[in-house]
Amino acid sequence: MSHRDTLFSAPIARLGDWTFDERVAEVFPDMIQRSVPGYSNIISMIGMLAERFVQPGTQVYDLGCSLGAATLSVRRNIHHDNCKIIAIDNSPAMIERCRRHIDAYKAPTPVDVIEGDIRNIAIENASMVVLNFTLQFLEPSERQALLDKIYQGLNPGGALVLSEKFSFEDAKVGELLFNMHHDFKRANGYSELEISQKRSMLENVMLTDSVETHKARLHQAGFEHSELWFQCFNFGSLVALKAEDAA
């Protein structure tokens, strides 16, 4: 059962950097619904994309799976035999709860839930890879290497779903969407103190890129096609496709 997020409702004397610890994992479903505009839509549509792209006898990777929402959405929409989902996260608290969530919903497609570093996992025989609000937590210097590895591990015709919080090259637009996101959080019951304290904890950990930067990286990795398919304020998701005739 998810609890309401009140982690930052009282002043915290020493704000450290953000971590996905036990306290965050406990309230994560409530936190993300009230903090990330369009999150439910992205999760449900990841399942729709899975129905289009997952092929028999292949693997799906959910890199940075948190509590397994994207994994479950994918699994509900796989209608082929001999598929497997590999869900990985480096937070022990998230992985523990993810395993519970996966086990609670029975389905034919097996899921390997792994506690580990997404930078170290091999990507093989993949028809789909999901990076759902994960890349932004890697050091910028490490992002291209991960995308390169994903491209190499995708089968021809495979898809990468990349959801992120965005920065904007147009400062005026960036300011507007930043403020609208804060309005969204206020409308969902977060106080100015909660918004401010969470932002302070995230600012050194979550480093955002522009859509243009994401597209440039995807192109460099080898993806022939990439486009923004969903956006709400400064959050959104891209899909990148490996050509069917790729070597």
From Swiss-Prot:
Q: By its UniProt entry, which CDD domains does this protein fall under?
A: AdoMet_MTases (cd02440)
Reactions the enzyme catalyzes: prephenate + S-adenosyl-L-methionine = carboxy-S-adenosyl-L-methionine + 3-phenylpyruvate + H2O
User: Keywords of this protein's UniProt record, alphabetized?
Assistant: S-adenosyl-L-methionine, Transferase
What are the recorded GO MF terms, alphabetically?
carboxyl- or carbamoyltransferase activity; S-adenosyl-L-methionine binding
Q: Which residues take part in binding S-adenosyl-L-methionine?
A: 39, 64-66, 89-90, 117-118, 132, 199
The answer to keyword Transferase applying to this record is yes
Domain of life according to the entry: Bacteria
EC number, UniProt record: 2.1.3.-
Q: Which GO terms describe its biological process?
A: tRNA wobble uridine modification
**Top enzyme category:** transferase
> What quaternary structure, including any partners, is listed in this protein's UniProt entry?
Homodimer.
Similarity-based family:
Belongs to the class I-like SAM-binding methyltransferase superfamily. Cx-SAM synthase family.
**NCBIfam families given for it?**
carboxy-S-adenosyl-L-methionine synthase CmoA, PRK15451.1
Under the heading HAMAP family, the entry gives: Cx_SAM_synthase
Q: Under what name is this protein listed?
A: Carboxy-S-adenosyl-L-methionine synthase
Species classification: Bacteria, Pseudomonadati, Pseudomonadota, Gammaproteobacteria, Enterobacterales
